[in-house]
C-alpha cells in the first residue's frame, strides 16, 4: 500500500513538474502557432487536460499558486485569449460556410454592387454635365412661377378692361334711350284699348243672345 502511494506521489510530482516546465518554457509565438494550426476539438481537449492536471497537482501538492511565476501567468492568460480567438474564428468559419452554402454572401455582394450603381446614378443625375441638377430644377420652377404670375396679371388686366368697356356701354345706353320707345308704348296702349272694346261688344252680344234664348224657352 505504501508502495502504491509512493508511485502516485511520484506520478503527481512528475506531472506537476512537467506542466510547470512546459508552462515556463513556452512562449507566445509557440502558443499562437499551436492554436492556429490545431483543430478546435484538439485545442479544447488539450486545454482541459492541461488545466485539469495542473489544478489537480496543485491541490494534491497543496503548494497553492506560489509556483506560478510571472511568465507562467502570462502564458496562461495568453493561452486563454488564444482559445477565445480560436473559438471566434471557428464560429466565423461555420457561419461563412453556412452563408456560402445558401449563397447569401453572393446575394449580399450583388446588393452592395446594386447600391453602389444606384448611388453613382443618383450622383450623375444630380450633376449632369457638371451642373447641379437639383439647383437647376429649383431655378426652373421659380422661373415658371414668375411666368405664371405674369400671365395671371395679364388676364386680370384684360378682364378689367372688358369690365370697364361693358360699364361704359351700359352707362351710355342708360343715359341715351331710343326715341322710338314712346311710340312703341302708344301702340301697345292702343292694342289694349282695342281689346277692351272688343270684349265689351262680345259681352253685349252674348247678353242679347241669352235674352232671346230665354224668350223662346218661355213660349
Curated annotation (Swiss-Prot):
GO MF terms here are:
channel activity; toxin activity
Q: What is its main location?
A: host cell
Task: Output the GO biological process annotations, alphabetical, semicolon-separated.
Answer: monoatomic ion transmembrane transport; symbiont-mediated activation of host autophagy; viral process
State the GO CC annotations: extracellular region; host caveola; host cell rough endoplasmic reticulum membrane; membrane
Residues crossing the lipid bilayer are 48-74
Q: Where is the signal peptide?
A: none
Its membrane topology, per UniProt?
Single-pass type III membrane protein
Cytoplasmic face residues: 75-219
Q: Establish whether keyword Secreted is in the entry.
A: yes
Sequence ranges on the Lumenal membrane side: 1-47
The record's listing under InterPro entries reads: Rotavirus_NSP4 (IPR002107)
| Location in or out of the cell | Host rough endoplasmic reticulum membrane; Host membrane, Host caveola; Secreted
Name the source's superkingdom: Viruses
Q: Which UniProt keywords are present, listed alphabetically?
A: Activation of host autophagy by virus, Enterotoxin, Glycoprotein, Host endoplasmic reticulum, Host membrane, Host-virus interaction, Ion channel, Ion transport, Membrane, Secreted, Signal-anchor, Toxin, Transmembrane, Transmembrane helix, Transport, Viral ion channel, Virulence
Asked if the keyword Nucleus belongs to this entry, the reply reads no
Quaternary state and partners of this protein?
A: Homotetramer. Interacts with the immature particle in the viroplasm. Interacts with host CAV1, early and late in infection. Interacts with host integrin ITGA1/ITGB1 heterodimer. Interacts with host integrin ITGA2/ITGB1 heterodimer. Interaction with microtubules blocks trafficking to the Golgi apparatus.
Job of this protein: Plays an essential role in the virus replication cycle by acting as a viroporin. Creates a pore in the host endoplasmic reticulum and as a consequence releases Ca(2+) in the cytoplasm of infected cell. In turn, high levels of cytoplasmic calcium trigger membrane trafficking and transport of viral ER-associated proteins to viroplasms, sites of viral genome replication and immature particle assembly. The secreted form acts as an enterotoxin that causes phospholipase C-dependent elevation of the intracellular calcium concentration in host intestinal mucosa cells. Increased concentration of intracellular calcium disrupts the cytoskeleton and the tight junctions, raising the paracellular permeability. Potentiates chloride ion secretion through a calcium ion-dependent signaling pathway, inducing age-dependent diarrhea.
Family, as annotated = Belongs to the rotavirus NSP4 family.
By what name is this protein known?
Non-structural glycoprotein 4
At the highest ranks, the source species' classification is: Viruses, Riboviria, Orthornavirae, Duplornaviricota, Resentoviricetes
Amino acid at each position: 500500500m505504501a508502495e502504491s502511494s509512493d508511485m502516485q506521489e511520484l506520478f503527481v510530482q512528475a506531472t506537476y513538474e512537467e506542466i510547470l516546465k512546459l508552462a515556463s518554457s513556452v512562449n507566445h509565438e509557440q502558443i499562437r502557432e499551436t492554436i492556429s494550426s490545431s483543430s478546435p476539438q484538439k485545442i479544447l481537449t488539450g486545454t482541459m487536460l492541461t488545466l485539469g492536471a495542473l489544478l489537480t497537482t496543485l491541490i494534491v501538492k497543496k503548494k497553492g499558486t506560489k509556483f506560478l511565476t510571472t511568465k507562467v501567468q502570462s502564458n496562461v492568460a495568453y493561452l486563454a485569449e488564444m482559445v477565445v480567438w480560436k473559438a471566434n474564428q471557428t464560429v466565423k468559419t461555420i457561419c461563412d460556410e453556412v452563408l456560402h452554402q445558401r449563397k447569401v454572401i453572393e446575394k449580399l455582394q450583388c446588393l452592395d454592387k446594386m447600391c453602389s450603381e444606384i448611388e453613382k446614378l443618383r450622383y450623375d443625375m444630380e450633376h449632369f454635365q457638371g451642373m447641379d441638377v437639383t439647383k437647376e430644377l429649383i431655378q426652373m420652377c421659380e422661373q415658371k412661377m414668375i411666368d405664371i404670375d405674369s400671365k395671371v396679371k395679364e388676364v386680370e388686366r384684360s378682364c378689367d378692361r372688358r369690365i370697364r368697356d361693358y360699364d361704359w356701354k351700359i352707362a351710355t345706353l342708360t343715359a341715351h334711350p331710343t326715341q322710338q320707345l314712346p311710340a312703341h308704348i302708344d301702340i301697345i296702349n292702343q292694342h289694349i284699348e282695342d281689346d277692351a272694346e272688343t270684349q265689351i261688344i262680345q259681352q253685349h252680344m252674348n247678353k242679347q243672345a241669352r235674352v232671346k234664348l230665354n224668350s223662346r224657352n218661355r213660349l
